[in-house]
Amino acid sequence: MFRGATSISIDSKGRIAIPTRYRAELLESYHGSFVCTVDIRQPCLLLYPLHEWEIVEQKLLALSNFDPAQRRIQRVMQGFATECEMDSAGRILLSPTLRQHAQLEQQIMLVGQLNKFEIWQDQQWQKQISEDLAIGSSEEMLHCEALKNLSL
């Protein structure tokens, strides 16, 4: 499980270094293989260990090709999906297309989201987390049925 937000740099070749606290698990459990794609609702990337992506892929496969909304999700998530391998220095290369989508520059945020990571442009992350915290303390959260039974 991946958790926490880490500020990391992206080098001139478009590589990011996975934090050392995750590397052993990622190599042992997932052989350092990933799939990176775009988030369809946010200006960030989603980085899945390959095995976790294969689960998502099966869900995408189950969607209807004849329903326009479902087809859009398939097209975007599968169309941008790019395999990445972690090198011996713990780095992965993000394609120019993916970097452009998320407007990634030098400083980025790698955010653990249980079975995957989100990759954000630093300023976009700060903006998003501020919005999330504001909504989290509002009445809007009280109306979500799934959250009513969540005990933290």
Curated annotation (Swiss-Prot):
A Gene Ontology cellular-component term: nucleoid
Domain SpoVT-AbrB: 5-52, 81-124
Record keyword Cytoplasm present: yes
Cell location: Cytoplasm, Nucleoid
An annotated GO BP: negative regulation of DNA-templated transcription initiation
Alphabetized UniProt keyword annotations: Cytoplasm, DNA-binding, Repeat, Transcription, Transcription regulation
Main localization of the protein described in the UniProt heading: cytoplasm
GO molecular function, one term: DNA-binding transcription factor activity
PROSITE patterns, A to Z: SPOVT_ABRB (PS51740)
Keyword RNA-binding in record: no
CDD domains assigned: MraZ_C, MraZ_N
Name of a matching Pfam family: MraZ
Subunit-structure text: Forms oligomers.
NCBIfam families in UniProt: division/cell wall cluster transcriptional repressor MraZ
Family statement drawn from the similarity comment of this UniProt entry: Belongs to the MraZ family.
PANTHER family found in the cross-reference section: TRANSCRIPTIONAL REGULATOR MRAZ
UniProt-recorded name of the protein: Transcriptional regulator MraZ
Organism annotation: Glaesserella parasuis serovar 5 (strain SH0165)
